[in-house]
Amino acid sequence: MSIYKALTIAGSDSGGGAGIQADIKTFQELDVFGMSAITAVTAQNTLGVHGVHPLTVETLRQQIDAVAEDLRPDAVKTGMLWNADMIEEVARKIDEYGFNRVIVDPVMIAKGGASLLRDESVATLKELLIPRSYAITPNVPEAETLTGMTISSLDDRKKAAEQLVKMGAQHVIIKGGHQPEDNHITDLLFDGSMFMQITHPYINTKHTHGTGCTFAAALTAQTAKGDSIHQAFEVAANFVREAVENTLGIGSGHGPTNHFAFKRNSLNTSR
């Protein structure tokens, strides 16, 4: 039996809803062996981020080397990278180990509004990571920051996706959670030549912490298994939809999604 492996390079979320915790849970649910290289330790829960403690670049380097030299991931996901030095190191390691299935989730702001990427690091991300990405998965605010565009419609998202491909991304997925229309959400994929849209009903819930991480992790898992970008996009969109529809309802603020829902359809939260 083939064992597919995925590496997440991201921050740790003590609340378990986002970051490497969400990534590893998602990998596991999709039958992919998950590995991690932690960029920062965050103290957070459903009420917000209470502290961000970046690790050193050397610590990050050692983690990536340890995984890459022995376990050889089939796909790599990047999440919270915090500063330009970390982004530069990740880019070096992508080149050193020849990672060619890199999913870039350009994490910038936490659900509660806390900054997870230094402002001066955005230019480095654009210069070094976008051209090395197999796919980049921004939400609308992140796509606006990366392109400098104002995005207020699906047509605007299409133009932004085309711009991100011109910046070097092979594939672009701009998620629609920040921009519901007619009580529906549309996620948009641009593969460099054609668009693919997945539309599903808008779910009115505050329990959406970690949806961006989870989407990108599902995309990474399916990519590690050899799916095409279109197949992986469909699985990722459905994975997140199930996770939000079958919310766990834990915590007093923006609660996490249900990473168990895709396989089990729903989790019996009474037990």
Swiss-Prot record:
Keywords: ATP-binding, Kinase, Nucleotide-binding, Thiamine biosynthesis, Transferase. GO terms for biological process: thiamine biosynthetic process; thiamine diphosphate biosynthetic process. Pfam families: Phos_pyr_kin. Catalyzes the phosphorylation of hydroxymethylpyrimidine phosphate (HMP-P) to HMP-PP, and of HMP to HMP-P. Shows no activity with pyridoxal, pyridoxamine or pyridoxine. Transmembrane segments: none annotated. One of its GO terms (cellular component) is cytosol. This is Hydroxymethylpyrimidine/phosphomethylpyrimidine kinase. GO terms for molecular function: ATP binding; hydroxymethylpyrimidine kinase activity; phosphomethylpyrimidine kinase activity. Belongs to the ThiD family. CDD domains: HMPP_kinase (cd01169). 4-amino-5-hydroxymethyl-2-methylpyrimidine binds at Q44. It is an enzyme of class 2 (transferase). It catalyses: 4-amino-5-hydroxymethyl-2-methylpyrimidine + ATP = 4-amino-2-methyl-5-(phosphooxymethyl)pyrimidine + ADP + H(+); 4-amino-2-methyl-5-(phosphooxymethyl)pyrimidine + ATP = 4-amino-2-methyl-5-(diphosphooxymethyl)pyrimidine + ADP. It comes from the Bacteria. Pathway: Cofactor biosynthesis; thiamine diphosphate biosynthesis; 4-amino-2-methyl-5-diphosphomethylpyrimidine from 5-amino-1-(5-phospho-D-ribosyl)imidazole: step 2/3; Cofactor biosynthesis; thiamine diphosphate biosynthesis; 4-amino-2-methyl-5-diphosphomethylpyrimidine from 5-amino-1-(5-phospho-D-ribosyl)imidazole: step 3/3. Its EC number is 2.7.1.49, 2.7.4.7.
